[in-house]
């Protein structure tokens, strides 16, 4: 019995395979003659299809039909993003006389394919597409032809990403440009700083070299002067005129006359050197054991005032050398005082061409000494310095020039801070002795005499009035001497004594 059932089922299946229910004439063509096309479709869109049998083309529920109308089929496993190229199979392999019968399956199949194609065309044109899997090609179709990706056909997020990358690249390029410019500016700044430093070093070297050259020239000049002085001392020469390159007897004669005239008034210039030497020795003790040698040089250079330069340059150079205690080293120091003098003013002061007299020279010397002493007092802060300088200089001048102390003793009367007048002692005594009778007040004189019983006190008061240049007191005590004593008869002796006392002071 069981064998019979199996045989019956076999013949049934065989019969159905030979005599199938054909719903349309193109079913056989679709699954027989055009099976390759259907297999291609099933391979692409229906991988789960069963050898071309329309298992997935049966009528579906309303939800499935809605999905199909929207281009989606959840049951078919349709891949929307794959490239496809579907030929219209409904008219393929049909003869001209063959009748076309549209079945329900064909209707569903055709509507589904049309909806899918329309949906994909709309998606291809829409800007809200999903990104393609391959970056070099667009996975959508436009008229069944694959289209390449274009910049104007990018998706919104891709375009925004590309714009962002372009902006970032611009910022990167700008940053690189600014960094390069900054490096160039830094290199230029360093180069300028290096050039400035080199220039400063060069200027400093030039200045030092110039100072060294000047110092060497001064030292050579000083050595020549010392050598010349030593030669003159050895030869016992009073003056000398050095020969130049071009012989000019007339010019030599003029220079010889100048030297001769200066040598005849040697005391005038010696006193100037004495003053400068006194200033020098007030700061440098030349009697110390470590002192070796020193020098004072005075240079006066000038040109023809008509050439436009009417200034005479005065250079006073001071030099000192000392031996280091306990060593073989020698310390040397040099300093120069540079100034200038207007030659036109000098020529105007000496327009007559004559030399100053002794009195005129003394007057100028006192003015100069007062100005120098004032400056030294400010610099040295020594209140006795200028006083000692004045007394020493005046007494030295009196001794060197053999001035008669009786006839020519001079006194200095300071009229203001800048001028000092000179008067002889006999002029002051003559003025002091001018006493009129009506000026004598006997009562006052008697009162003073009672307080001063000794003549030594009267003489002391007279001396103080002479020293202080108090003409009123001098007249008063001179009158006392004339009125109440015989000392007045020997007043000349008294004044000589006063001169001696003043000189001793």
Swiss-Prot record:
How does the record classify its membrane topology? Single-pass membrane protein
Q: What else is known?
A: Addition of antibodies against PIMMS43 to the infectious blood meal significantly reduces transmission of malaria parasites by A.coluzzii mosquitoes.
Point out the coiled-coil segments of this chain.
Answer: none
- Main site of residence? membrane
Gene that codes for this?
PIMMS43
Q: Name the cystine pairs.
A: none
Any one of the GO CC terms: membrane
- Relate the outcome reported for changing residue 217 to L: Prevalent in Kenyan and Tanzanian populations
The positions making up the signal sequence are: 1-24
Cellular compartment(s): Membrane
Region entry Disordered, spans: 188-221
Protein's name according to its UniProt entry? Ookinete surface protein PIMMS43
Q: Which domain of life is it from?
A: Eukaryota
Is Membrane there in the keyword field?
yes
The UniProt keyword set, sorted, is:
Membrane, Signal, Transmembrane, Transmembrane helix
Which segments cross the bilayer? Answer: 485-505
Q: What does this protein do?
A: Involved in ookinete evasion of the mosquito complement-like response, oocyst maturation, sporozoite development and infectivity.
Q: How does it assemble?
A: Monomer. May form multimers with an unknown protein(s).
Entry annotated with the keyword Membrane: yes
């Amino acid at each position: 019995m069981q064998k019979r059932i199996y045989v019956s089922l076999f013949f049934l299946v065989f019969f159905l395979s030979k005599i199938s229910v054909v719903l349309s004439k193109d079913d056989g063509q679709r699954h027989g003659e055009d099976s390759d096309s259907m297999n291609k479709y099933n391979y692409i869109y229906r991988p789960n299809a069963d050898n071309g049998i329309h298992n997935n083309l049966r009528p579906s529920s309303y939800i499935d039909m809605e999905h199909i109308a929207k281009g989606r089929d959840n049951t078919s496993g349709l891949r929307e993003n794959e490239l496809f190229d579907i030929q219209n199979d409904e008219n393929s392999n049909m003869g001209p006389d063959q009748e076309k019968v549209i079945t329900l399956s064909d209707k569903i199949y055709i509507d589904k394919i049309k909806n899918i194609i329309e949906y994909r065309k709309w998606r291809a044109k829409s800007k809200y597409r999903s990104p393609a899997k391959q970056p070099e090609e667009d996975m959508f179709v436009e008229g069944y032809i694959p289209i390449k990706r274009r910049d104007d056909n990018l998706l919104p997020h891709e375009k925004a990403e590309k714009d962002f990358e372009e902006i970032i690249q611009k910022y990167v390029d700008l940053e690189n440009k600014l960094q390069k410019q900054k490096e160039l500016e830094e290199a230029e700044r360093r180069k300028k700083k290096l050039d400035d430093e080199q220039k400063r070093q060069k200027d400093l070297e030039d200045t030092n070299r110039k100072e060294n050259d000047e110092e060497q020239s001064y030292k050579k000049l000083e050595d020549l002067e010392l050598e010349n002085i030593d030669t003159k001392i050895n030869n016992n020469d009073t003056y000398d005129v050095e020969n130049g390159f071009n012989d000019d007897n007339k010019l030599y004669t003029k220079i010889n006359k100048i030297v001769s005239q200066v040598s005849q008034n040697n005391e005038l210039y010696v006193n100037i050197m004495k003053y400068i030497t006194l200033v020098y020795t007030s700061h440098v003790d030349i009697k110390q054991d470590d002192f070796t040698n020193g020098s004072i040089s005075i240079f006066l250079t000038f040109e023809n005032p008509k050439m436009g330069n009417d200034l005479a340059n005065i250079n006073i150079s001071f030099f000192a050398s000392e031996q280091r205690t306990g060593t073989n080293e020698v310390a040397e120091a040099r300093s120069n005082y540079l100034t200038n003098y207007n030659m036109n003013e000098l020529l105007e002061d000496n327009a007559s061409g004559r030399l100053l007299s002794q009195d005129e020279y003394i007057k100028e010397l006192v003015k100069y000494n007062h100005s120098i002493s004032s400056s030294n007092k400010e610099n040295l802060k020594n209140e006795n310095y200028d006083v000692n300088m004045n007394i020493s200089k005046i007494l030295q001048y009196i001794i060197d020039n053999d001035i008669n102390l009786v006839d020519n003793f001079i006194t200095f009367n300071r009229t203001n801070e800048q001028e000092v007048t000179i008067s002889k002692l006999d002029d002051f005594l003559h003025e002091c002795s001018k006493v009129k009778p009506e000026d004598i007040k006997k009562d006052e004189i008697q009162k003073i005499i009672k307080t001063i019983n000794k003549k030594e006190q009267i003489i002391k008061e007279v001396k103080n009035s002479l020293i202080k240049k108090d003409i009123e007191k001098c007249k008063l005590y001179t009158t006392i001497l004339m009125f109440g004593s015989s000392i007045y008869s020997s007043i000349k002796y008294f004044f000589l004594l006063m001169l001696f006392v003043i000189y001793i002071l």
